[in-house]
């Protein structure tokens, strides 16, 4: 079972998504300094095998460039400005590498890492995705951060690939209901210890569809807790009363786009120091 040092663990989603500098070193430094418990970020691999922190398949939304990450070289990525949309004036900043975050994390040994694997083993992309996943894990092991790292993916195939090779050296973050993860050989309840709660259903065609109301029903929480799986609350809830309700149902971890505001709210509630 996931255990928080605080009554509620605050994870900074992409380092704090709402300020135009998501997944940058500036964002990560800011939220680590303010006292978050966990950094959530996204990793993709460039055409020449470097691990870059980028959420989207392309660089178009978050930088001044265009193109798929996996089609660009590191040299091309490093010419981009990932702070171009910042809500405050700041110097240009290239998208960081995973190793840059891991170097920064050495300064904050108590901060947990939530690493989302964004290259998926879709048809024709299997080799690339598994190569990327292995490279990420090898680097995490190299930096000795396994025990404070959660392997996170919407792809059940990626999660079980990592688990089969590295086992319990890492922690694992899945998505609930489990059908979101797609086809898997393993039962995620056998190794996943954090589940991001998504209010979704699967129609007769197997398509996963979101409910308009992002809050999952209370009856979803206790069965997970009984199996040692901690429900994680996603940024989509947006309203503090909904988060507070989830905390009362047993969740003790929140992934937020506004970590400073969330920390202030939790401190006011006596749920964080």
Language-model segments: residues:
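Phosphate-group recognition and catalysis centered on beta-loop-alpha active-site segments
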Residues: 1-273
């Amino acid at each position: 079972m996931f255990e928080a040092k605080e009554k509620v663990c605050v994870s900074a989603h992409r380092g704090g998504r709402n300020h135009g500098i998501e997944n940058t070193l500036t964002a990560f430094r800011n939220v680590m300094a303010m006292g978050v418990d966990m950094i959530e970020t996204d990793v993709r691999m460039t055409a020449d095998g470097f691990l870059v922190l980028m959420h989207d398949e392309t660089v178009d939304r978050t930088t001044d460039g265009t193109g798929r990450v996996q089609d660009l070289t590191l040299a091309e990525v490093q010419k981009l400005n990932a702070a171009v949309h910042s809500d405050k004036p700041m110097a240009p900043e290239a998208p960081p590498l995973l190793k840059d975050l891991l170097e920064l994390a050495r300064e904050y040994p108590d901060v947990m890492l939530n690493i989302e694997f964004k290259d998926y083993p879709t048809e024709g992309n299997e080799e690339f995705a598994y190569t990327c996943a292995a490279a990420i894990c090898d680097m995490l092991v190299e930096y000795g951060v396994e025990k404070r790292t959660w392997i996170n993916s919407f792809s059940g195939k990626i999660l079980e690939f990592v688990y089969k090779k590295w086992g319990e050296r890492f922690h694992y973050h899945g998505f609930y209901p489990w059908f979101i993860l797609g086809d898997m050989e393993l039962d995620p309840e056998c190794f996943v210890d954090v589940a991001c709660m998504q209010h979704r259903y699967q129609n007769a065609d197997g398509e996963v569809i979101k409910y308009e109301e992002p809050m999952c029903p209370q009856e979803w929480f206790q069965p997970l807790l009984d199996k040692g799986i901690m429900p994680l609350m996603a940024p989509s809830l947006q309203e503090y009363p909904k988060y507070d309700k989830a905390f009362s149902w047993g969740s003790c971890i929140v992934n937020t786009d506004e970590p400073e505001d969330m920390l202030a709210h939790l401190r006011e509630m006596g749920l964080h120091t």
